[in-house]
């Protein structure tokens, strides 16, 4: 009898506590992680219908997570249209992970961006089915840019991106957010025969970044984008944390497809496995670094330069 009463009391207590957790997602509760801070972007106004501009709603969810000690920003399956560019924290992007502010301290917060699914095919688009179009990847959680942007010809300028980590106010401009990206696809808008003007993901100022099952691609056919030699503007699929931030980084199952001028841009301390670049002029680019990187399987196809 006592055991039954105690179990019932515990269940009631947990239910009360977790009911008060702001914007708890149903998937989190169903999986047993009922007291984890999970913020569903639909609860902040995102539609995921491919029509509404979801930029403001998703940004609100990201800001809320940072302001409340971190947690998971959850994207249910759908196509999230991004039609507004933002400039803040010395970066330009549709979505910005703002820095954690702790005056006089150097502490960190973890934020996870997690989709429901991310469909990645083993080749460019779906050539094995006789099709060659970006829509074959729509059956997943896709954040797509509806802004063409402007050509960027200055390599020293800050790139315009779909997602970026904003700069912090400490010595190395470190964001102090540990960022995890899982089961998400990011699509940049492009013109036929040209690389996208926007870059994909810019984590140059992230404290640390971890990924699993992430796809970054453009809106046009891959066969029209096999390293166009006269397309001289700069864009990159994935930009890792910069020199002197001394972060620990882990990329797993990240695919840059069809196509950017640079597939991946790395500095030091990068750990990577199952990284794939398609149709980029430079597949894997290593910038200034004082320490080493470690990689397992990396793959490049239809790229002019594999290592730069």
Question: Where are the language model's segments positioned?
Answer:
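Bacterial N-terminal signal peptides that target proteins for export
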Residues: 1-6
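Bacterial N-terminal signal peptides
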Residues: 7-16
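Right-handed parallel beta-helix/beta-solenoid
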Residues: 21-60, 79
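Detector for repetitive beta-architecture
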Residues: 38, 70-72, 77-79, 88, ...
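N-terminal extracellular ligand-recognition/capping segment immediately after the signal peptide
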Residues: 45, 55, 59-135, 140-149, ...
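Extracellular beta-strand solenoids
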Residues: 75, 82, 97, 115, ...
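Right-handed parallel beta-helix
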Residues: 137, 168-279
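Surface-exposed, low-hydrophobicity beta-strand/loop segments enriched in small/polar/acidic residues
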Residues: 155-168, 181
């Amino acid at each position: 009898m006592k055991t039954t009463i105690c179990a019932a009391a515990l269940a009631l207590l947990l239910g009360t506590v977790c009911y008060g957790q702001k914007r708890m997602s149903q998937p989190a509760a169903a999986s047993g992680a009922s007291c984890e801070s999970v913020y569903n972007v639909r609860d902040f106004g995102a539609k995921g219908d491919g029509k509404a501009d979801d930029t403001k709603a998703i940004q609100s969810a990201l800001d809320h997570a940072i302001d409340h000690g971190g947690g998971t920003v959850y994207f249910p399956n759908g196509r999230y249209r991004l039609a507004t560019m933002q400039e803040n924290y010395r970066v330009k992007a549709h979505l910005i992970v703002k820095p954690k502010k702790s005056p006089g301290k150097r502490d960190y917060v973890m934020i996870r961006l997690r989709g429901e699914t991310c469909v990645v095919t083993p080749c460019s688009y779906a050539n094995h089915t006789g099709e060659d179009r970006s829509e074959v990847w729509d059956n997943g959680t896709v954040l797509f840019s509806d802004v063409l942007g402007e050509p960027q010809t200055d390599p020293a300028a800050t790139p315009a991106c779909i997602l970026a980590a904003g700069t912090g106010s400490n010595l190395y401009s470190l964001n102090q957010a540990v960022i995890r990206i899982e089961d998400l696809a990011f699509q940049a808008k492009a013109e036929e025969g040209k690389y996208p003007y926007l870059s994909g993901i810019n984590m140059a100022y992230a404290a640390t970044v971890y990924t699993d099952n992430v796809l970054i691609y453009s809106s046009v056919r891959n066969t029209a984008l096999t390293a166009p030699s006269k397309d001289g503007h700069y864009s990159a699929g994935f930009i890792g944390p910069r020199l002197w931030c001394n972060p620990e980084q882990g990329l797993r199952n990240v695919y840059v497809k069809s196509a950017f001028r640079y597939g991946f841009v790395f500095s030091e301390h990068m750990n990577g496995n199952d990284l794939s670049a398609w149709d980029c002029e430079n597949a894997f680019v290593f910038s200034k670094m004082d320490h080493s990187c470690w990689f397992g399987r990396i793959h490049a196809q239809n790229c002019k330069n594999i290592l730069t």
